A protein has these predicted regions:
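A conserved regulatory-domain signal marking ACT and ACT-like small-molecule sensing domains
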Residues: 1-139
Length: 139
């Protein structure tokens, strides 16, 4: 029976980090179903949803702990289940671009939360506007 584990890992950004994590998954017999990976400052963060049987995931939990100890990664894993599809809701995509200021993400999250709107996926970044150099926030 297919079981799932959610894995979160963060560590110093370096070449081969994704390879090392996925090698452990493959060697344990797991399959990456979904992932999000990004550099945040000098750190590299990974989120993965991995499928496998009970034995695969038990072995993976142990091997991830070893990888964390040997490589300086902070690794957290948690067993989970497939998220049931939400047929009672309509999916929306929201794009926001504004001047960057403290609390923008918090305000947007509060707007959605106060209206009972779940956030399924979110990605933000800051940058300087091309012609003016103004600090910008994009969601």
């Amino acid at each position: 029976m297919k079981q799932l584990i959610a894995i979160s890992a963060i560590g110093n950004d370096r070449t081969g980090l994704v390879y090392d994590l996925t090698r452990v998954v493959v060697e344990c017999g797991g399959n990456v179903l979904e992932s999000r990976m990004t550099a945040l400052g000098n750190e590299f963060a990974v989120l993965m949803l991995v499928a496998g049987n009970w034995h695969t995931l038990a072995k993976l939990e142990g091997e991830l702990a070893k990888l964390g100890e040997s490589s300086g990664l902070t690794v957290i894993s948690r067993r989970t289940e497939i998220r049931p599809p939400r047929t009672d809701m309509v999916s929306y995509t929201v794009d926001v671009v504004c001047l960057d200021q403290p609390g923008v993400l918090h305000s947007l999250a509060g707007f959605f939360s106060s209206r009972g709107i779940d956030i399924g996926d979110i990605s933000t970044r800051t940058y300087n506007a091309a012609h003016t150099g103004a600090p910008m926030f994009s969601l």
